């Protein structure tokens, strides 16, 4: 009886097909069919590839043989044999001989490779005024401040004892109306007023009574890069009842010449450590003056909780009235 093959492609079915042993009409398989019988010895010559293998062919005569028919290996030490012969020192694998000093890897004589170029050849700053903004002053530009931002000078530089206050600007000069800007300082008490008129520091009163503030002179043109006017401050010498130092810039004869701070580009104030030259902070005033004739640039003031600590605030407040207006505000007679 024909038994069909098991169905193909079925999945998940664990019942596989087998022929039942009692199928009618099908005789039982020979019980001896699967019994192992050892092979009988035979004198019949096996064909190539049969088992057991035929007797090995004898090797050609004339060459000495080892038992089993294998060729005799080369004598010990022959080229290509193992172990390899001892190589002469320095030829293969041996460490290289010590090179004479200076041939390989020794440092080059000073000045041949990588030595710094002579000063002024590469990377030197361009002459003042040729390209864009002026180069940053020595010691880096310091922290760039924005309007009303405050900074603790003492925390930024714990060694700070003396200040350099630099004020700079450019002017749009005309042949008939030259610009003359002046930097001034007001030494104020806790009430926000000068104690006497001598607390007003400017080009005609360059040194304060306590010698703590010193004006370095008037720049009548505003020409050149960097600081146009400089004020030096000895913080340790400032009188105890002075709590604020106000730094301002005014335009001389502004009303007569019809001038204001819209005609003064690239104005700034910077604060530096006078003893080390390190710039602590810088405030760009170019957009702060507007159509005004006086500009309060910034203030150096005592820390209310510790009078020995000093801070700076970027004010940037433009005002009308030029210098006479500031004198009235701060109580100068």
UniProtKB/Swiss-Prot annotation:
Entry annotated with the keyword Repeat: yes
Keyword terms of this UniProt record: cAMP, cAMP-binding, Nucleotide-binding, Repeat
C- repeat residues: 87-95, 99-107, 108-116, 117-125, 126-134
Annotated spans, 2 X 12 AA repeats of motif B: 84-107
Region Disordered: start-end pairs: 1-144
InterPro entries per UniProt: Stress/Tellurium_Resist, TerD
Annotated region described as 5 X 9 AA repeats of motif C, given as residue ranges: 87-134
Low complexity biased stretches: 46-69, 87-132
Pro residues: bias regions: 70-86
Ranges: B- repeats: 84-95, 96-107
Region annotation (3 X 5 AA repeats of motif A) ranges: 48-83
UniProt repeat feature A-, residue ranges: 48-52, 67-71, 79-83
Gene3D superfamilies in the record: sav2460 like domains (2.60.60.30)
A molecular-function term among this protein's GO annotations: cAMP binding
Quaternary structure note: Heterodimer of CABP1A and CABP1B. CABP1A/CABP1B could also associate with p31/p34 to form an active complex.
Entry's family note: Belongs to the CAPAB/TerDEXZ family.
Protein name (Swiss-Prot/TrEMBL): cAMP-binding protein 1
Encoding gene (name): capA-1
């Amino acid at each position: 009886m024909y038994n069909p093959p098991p169905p193909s492609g079925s999945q998940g079915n664990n019942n596989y097909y087998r022929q039942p042993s009692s199928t009618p009409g099908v005789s039982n398989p020979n019980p001896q069919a699967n019994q192992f019988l050892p092979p009988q010895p035979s004198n019949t010559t096996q064909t190539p590839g049969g088992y057991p293998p035929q007797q090995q062919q004898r090797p050609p005569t004339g060459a000495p043989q080892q038992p089993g028919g294998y060729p005799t290996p080369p004598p010990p030490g022959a080229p290509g044999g193992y172990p390899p012969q001892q190589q002469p020192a320095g030829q293969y694998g041996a460490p290289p001989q010590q090179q004479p000093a200076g041939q390989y890897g020794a440092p080059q004589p000073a000045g041949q490779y990588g030595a710094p170029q002579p000063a002024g050849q590469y990377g030197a700053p361009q002459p003042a005024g040729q390209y864009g903004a002026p180069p940053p002053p020595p010691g880096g530009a310091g922290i760039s401040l924005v309007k009303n931002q405050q900074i603790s000078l003492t925390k930024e530089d714990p060694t700070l004892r003396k200040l350099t206050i630099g004020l700079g600007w450019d002017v749009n000069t005309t042949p008939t109306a030259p610009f003359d800007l002046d930097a001034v300082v007001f030494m104020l008490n806790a009430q926000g007023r000068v104690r006497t008129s001598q607390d007003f520091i400017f080009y005609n009163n360059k040194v304060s009574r306590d010698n703590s503030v010193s004006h370095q002179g008037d720049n009548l043109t505003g020409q050149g890069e960097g600081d146009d006017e400089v004020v030096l401050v000895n913080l340790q010498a400032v009188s105890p009842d002075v709590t604020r130092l106000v730094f301002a810039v005014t335009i001389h004869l502004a009303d007569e010449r019809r001038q204001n701070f819209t005609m003064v580009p690239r104005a700034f104030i910077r604060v530096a450590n006078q003893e080390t030259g390190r710039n602590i902070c810088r405030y760009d005033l170019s957009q702060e003056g507007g159509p005004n004739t006086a500009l309060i640039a910034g203030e150096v003031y005592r820390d209310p909780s510790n009078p020995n600590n000093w801070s700076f605030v970027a004010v940037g407040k433009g005002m009308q009235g030029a210098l006479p207006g500031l004198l009235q505000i701060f109580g100068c007679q």
